[in-house]
Each structure stands twice: as structure tokens, then as C-alpha cells.
Amino acid sequence: MQRRTRGASSLRLARCLTPANLIRGDNAGVPERRIFGGCLLPTPEGLLSAAVGALRQRSDDAQPAFLTCTDRSVRLAARQHNTVPESLIVDGLASDPHYEYIRHYASAATQALGEVELPGGQLSRAILTQYWKYLQTVVPSGLDVPEDPVGDCDPSLHVLLRPTLAPKLLARTPFKSGAVAAKYAATVAGLRDALHRIQQYMFFMRPADPSRPSTDTALRLNELLAYVSVLYRWASWMLWTTDKHVCHRLSPSNRRFLPLGGSPEAPAETFARHLDRGPSGTTGSMQCMALRAAVSDVLGHLTRLANLWQTGKRSGGTYGTVDTVVSTVEVLSIVHHHAQYIINATLTGYGVWATDSLNNEYLRAAVDSQERFCRTTAPLFPTMTAPSWARMELSIKAWFGAALAADLLRNGAPSLHYESILRLVASRRTTWSAGPPPDDMASGPGGHRAGGGTCREKIQRARRDNEPPPLPRPRLHSTPASTRRFRRRRADGAGPPLPDANDPVAEPPAAATQPATYYTHMGEVPPRLPARNVAGPDRRPPAATCPLLVRRASLGSLDRPRVWGPAPEGEPDQMEATYLTADDDDDDARRKATHAASARERHAPYEDDESIYETVSEDGGRVYEEIPWMRVYENVCVNTANAAPASPYIEAENPLYDWGGSALFSPPGRTGPPPPPLSPSPVLARHRANALTNDGPTNVAALSALLTKLKREGRRSR
């Protein structure tokens, strides 16, 4: 043990030694090479790679183990056209029996429910109060509706999350018969498991590359989104059945029930039409068999619940009515929460693979069905926006961010597929932020569309009117035109003024008229990049004729860091101070300053030159303005004509001794001309022959023995 420790210390000491052949002789070039070659300042490429690596690590930590395993990556790499075999999706479902795919969302939802605690009895009374408000808006007048109790609370958060997360139901016996109540509880438990399987299917069906289209994934998304529309039709029928039962209880003499929305379609007809003429049923593809089986399982549970609601006998009195209302809200909340998962997951990232991306007709129909259902049943069922949902779910948004960042770093520019989606989103956000929606997309009373034509005709008309013109693919190292358009709009004052968060002088514009909806429309402002190639003081236009943004750029406020508080008096301009000449009376210094100024004038941009931030028109021209390639780093040559020749020994990386693949202290082979003869040096007395030779391999054992002997002699001399 002592010998092993002594040997390890000797090796650590030998690792820090400098070879003797570098100590003797004239080696003037070695320090420069060690300084500039050993400089560890990060490069822009290294910083971008580190940022993408951090995104990837954060994403991998948030994913289930199966999504990041090697076996899945190998099987996806063997596929063509960015497809995912359904057998791989089924393996993902089998590998996640405890629903790890939704653990972040479940944790955040449980924490939110814990912060707003509400007992079961109080929650049931609050749900009943909300139901009375809803019933007064959908049935004709003359119905004796109970008055709202004083001091009621808002149960929206618990209605949205509790039925899906809590294992126990609020209304455990909504039917008179105990056997029927037990069948109801078993059906709800089976429905929860079936909904989880569809959500797992959607979670694990993502391809490896979000920057390319995927035919199989587009077909599966169409099936899922069409299935969402079917869910909301079933939910409307369930609520209509409950309303009819409650109205008969409140007014037994009036046997006619005429709701404002009319009688919905029976669930059996809706389900049969979807299974026969749905997206996966009409294409004949074999890559949606497991998805169709999972959808059929869910529809079977919903059919059993519909039969219980239609034929089951309810308890009489007030408690029977309360249990009927609460159980209906619970079941519909579970289905509504499941539909929100599919829609919000599509908006968070899966929409990149959908047919026509965000203009997908099934996505439009699903969102339209959800919004119509929420408006008709208000204030019973709240809706979670996609940003709020993504902050709770975490994993899907992190995965798409890391995957798209890696592709952008690898290719230098977004792909054609990804860029077309970004342009579509930017164009539609500009349209909606400028004013109210067009007539064919406006909503009439009750959530129905006011424009004429079918849903497909509306989607095609909106797509034809608002789709941007096709643009050529951008070249590498180019500047997006969206930023230039934003600056052009800010400089010219065209269009609605956008707020500037960093400008304390600008006044906030008046709020634009927003459509009446339950969804939060995020009016994001494109980020402003720092100004580059700013002209010198002699080439700036008069400040009075420049817009506000140009005046701020001329003052250098976009280049220097923001200083909080008043600026010190008499501080010179940063850009002008850069070009000040020396205050020396020496002719040589003045001549050098004049030469530097003339060189800058030769290389300075002229008024006629195109700037990389030059604005372009909206007539379908080039979106990207090419930036000339410039080298960031120049090779530094520090040797002068009279300097000593460079040493032929070049340092290389080695994981152990920093000396390449050769033996200990043995330099690499000579690649240049032979070195000049070294000056003779006195031969020093050596303790052991051939222990430290200048050329040839070194004996590690001899070196260890030498160091041990020197250590012992040092102790004796003390």
C-alpha cells in the first residue's frame, strides 16, 4: 500500500515536469505557441454548442426514459422520411405503466389544488351554483331556478383539474340502484385508463426531427383532432340529457323541454360515422391500427356512460338532483381535460407535422368545437391556454426547443418546412393584432360562426386569403427579414405602433379591439437585435430628421449596456471617443493617427452601400439579405524576421501527459527542417545512467526510483 501511494505521487510529479530538451537551447517560439495555442477563450461556435447542449440536457431530464433510450434512437435512424413505426409507439406505452409521461403536469396541478383547498361538500355546492347560472341562459323563461346562495366561491380550478387527478369521485352514487352506481364507478375508472393510453400514444408518436414533415405523424394527428370534435359532440349530448332531467324535476307539469341550442345528435351515430369515415378509416393506412383500437376503447366507455345517463333511475329529492348535476360535471370535466391535452400538445409543438401545419382543417374544427362547447356551457367548464399548459407540462416544449435548436446550429438556417410555419404564425399574429377578425371567422351568438358556408369552406377561404406568398430558401449566415420589417414599421410609422419595453419616452398605444373569446391571444413583439455596422459621426444624418429608433441608434443606446439612473455630466459619446486622435504633439503619433483615419475612411460603408438591416418591400422579394462572410479569428504570427527559428516540437493533447501518443516525455516526429545545432552545454552529473535521455523512451521505473532517491537524500541532509 505504501509503495502504491509512493508511485502514484511520483507519477503526479512527473506529469508536471518540463522535458529537458525544451529547457536547453534556443526555443523562442515555444512560449508564443503555448500562449496562443493554449488560449481557452470560448468561440461563438463553442458558445452556441454549449447552449444547445444545455437545452438538450434539460430536455432529457424532463423526458421518460424510453423517449431518450438508445434503442429508440437506433430504430428511428433506420427509418426513412421521418416516420415512426407504430410498434415503437406501442413499446413506449408498455414501458410507461405508471404514467411517467405526465408526471410534471400532475405535480404542478396537485400543487395548484393544494394551494386552493376546497372541501368536497363546498365544491359540490359551488358546482351547483354555477350550473344554475348556466341553466338560466339555455332554457326558456318561466322555469323556477333556485336562487344562488350567498358567499359562493369560484370552483373553476377544481372543476378543471380535480376530476382527472383525484381518485375519488364527488358523486359516488348518482343512481338509485347500487349495482348501477358500481357500474358507473367502474366505467369512469376504465375511461380514465383509456384516455391515458391515447395521451401516451400522442406523447410517444413524435419523430426524431421536428424540422421535416412526417406523413405518418400527420395522419395520426388528423385522427386525434377529429376524435376531439367527436368528444365535444358527445359532451354536448350528455349535458343536454342532464338539462332535460333537471328541468323535468324542477317543473313536472311542463313535460316539454326546448333548449335554445336544439337537440344534439345521438352518440351512437356520431361514433359510427367517425369510425367509418374518419381520417384513419378512409386512408387504409396500417400505421394507425393501435390508435384506432385505443379510440374505439374510449368510445365504448363513453357509450356505456351515455346508456347509464339515458336509462338509469335517479334518486328523488334535492340530493338526487345535486348528484346528477355533480356527476355530469365530473365526467364532462375528465373528457374536456383530455381534449385540452390533445389540442394544447398540438399547439405546443406537434403542429409542425400536421397537414398544412396550423391551417389544418381538423385542428380548426377541434378548436371550434371546444370554444363552442365552453361558450355554450359557461361558466361551468374553464379552458386552459396553451402557454399555461406548457408551463405545467414542461417536457414537450423542452423537447421541441432542444431538437429545433440542434437543427438550427447544424444547418445554420431553419429548414423550409420550419420556416414556412414561422412565417405563417407571424403573418396571422400581425393580422389578429391589427384589429378584429374577418367576418367569416367572427363568432355569432352561442359560439356559432356568423359567416356562411361549411367549416371546410371557411378554412379554405381563410387559408387562401391569409397565406403568405412562397419565398426562396434563405442562404447561410443571413439576417431574417422579419426583423427588418419590424424596424421598417417602427421607423416609418406604418401600421399599428408596437410598444418598446426599453424606451421610456414612447407612450403605450391604445388597446386594439380583441375578439370575445376565452383564449388568451399573446401579442408578442419580435426581439430587437443590437445594431451592427453603425456609421461614424461624420456619416450620420441630422438628428431632427430621423425617427426615434434611428436617433437612439445614432446615440449608441442600442450598443452600450443600459445604465440605471442619470448619466454623468460631460461624459463623451462612446462612438466618437473611439475615433479621437492622440493629444500628443509628436509628428510620428499624428502621422499614425492620420493614417488610421484614412484607412477607416477607405473601409467605411458609403451612403449607397446596402446595409444588412436594409428594409425590403412586401412584394415577395428576398426575405434574407446576404451577409458577406468574415473570418472571426485571424492567425497571429508573432515571429519577426530576426527571431529565432521555431522549434520543431509542437505541443499536442494527451489525456495523461499532454504529449501525444508517444511514450513519456518523448516528442513527436519532426515535421519541419532539422533544428540548428544546440550550443554545447556542460554535462551534469547524473545519478543513474539513461534515466532522462533527450531522445528515446524514458523508463518510468527509473524515473520513480530517481525521485525516491532524491527525496531520501533531502531528508538525510536535513
UniProtKB/Swiss-Prot annotation:
<keyword id="KW-0804">Transcription</keyword>
<dbReference type="GO" id="GO:0020002">
    <property type="term" value="C:host cell plasma membrane"/>
</dbReference>
<keyword id="KW-0472">Membrane</keyword>
<keyword id="KW-0899">Viral immunoevasion</keyword>
<keyword id="KW-1043">Host membrane</keyword>
<comment type="similarity">
    <text>Belongs to the herpesviridae HHV-1 VP11/12 protein family.</text>
</comment>
<protein>
    <recommendedName>
        <fullName>Tegument protein UL46</fullName>
    </recommendedName>
</protein>
<keyword id="KW-1032">Host cell membrane</keyword>
<keyword id="KW-0920">Virion tegument</keyword>
<comment type="function">
    <text>Plays a role in the activation of the host PI3K/AKT pathway to promote cell survival. Interacts with and activates host LCK and thereby recruits downstream partners SHC1, GRB2 and PI3KR1 in order to activate the PI3K pathway by phosphorylating host AKT on its activating residues. This mechanism is inhibited by the viral protein US3 that instead promotes incorporation of UL46 into virions. Plays a role in the inhibition of TMEM173/STING-mediated type I interferon production. Interacts with host DOK2 and induces its degradation.</text>
</comment>
<keyword id="KW-1035">Host cytoplasm</keyword>
<comment type="subunit">
    <text>Interacts with VP16. Interacts with host LCK, PIK3R1, SHC1 AND GRB2; these interactions promote the activation of the PI3K/AKT pathway. Interacts with host YWHAB. Interacts with ICP0; this interaction targets UL46 for degradation by the proteasome. Interacts (via N-terminus) with host TMEM173. Interacts (via C-terminus) with host TBK1. Interacts with host DOK2.</text>
</comment>
<keyword id="KW-0946">Virion</keyword>
<dbReference type="Pfam" id="PF03387">
    <property type="entry name" value="Herpes_UL46"/>
</dbReference>
<keyword id="KW-0805">Transcription regulation</keyword>
<dbReference type="GO" id="GO:0019033">
    <property type="term" value="C:viral tegument"/>
</dbReference>
<feature type="region of interest" description="Disordered">
    <location>
        <begin position="581"/>
        <end position="611"/>
    </location>
</feature>
<dbReference type="GO" id="GO:0016020">
    <property type="term" value="C:membrane"/>
</dbReference>
<dbReference type="GO" id="GO:0006355">
    <property type="term" value="P:regulation of DNA-templated transcription"/>
</dbReference>
<feature type="region of interest" description="Disordered">
    <location>
        <begin position="433"/>
        <end position="510"/>
    </location>
</feature>
<keyword id="KW-0945">Host-virus interaction</keyword>
<dbReference type="GO" id="GO:0030430">
    <property type="term" value="C:host cell cytoplasm"/>
</dbReference>
<dbReference type="InterPro" id="IPR005051">
    <property type="entry name" value="Herpes_UL46"/>
</dbReference>
<dbReference type="GO" id="GO:0052170">
    <property type="term" value="P:symbiont-mediated suppression of host innate immune response"/>
</dbReference>
<keyword id="KW-0597">Phosphoprotein</keyword>
<feature type="compositionally biased region" description="Gly residues">
    <location>
        <begin position="444"/>
        <end position="454"/>
    </location>
</feature>
<feature type="compositionally biased region" description="Basic and acidic residues">
    <location>
        <begin position="455"/>
        <end position="467"/>
    </location>
</feature>
<keyword id="KW-1090">Inhibition of host innate immune response by virus</keyword>
<keyword id="KW-0010">Activator</keyword>
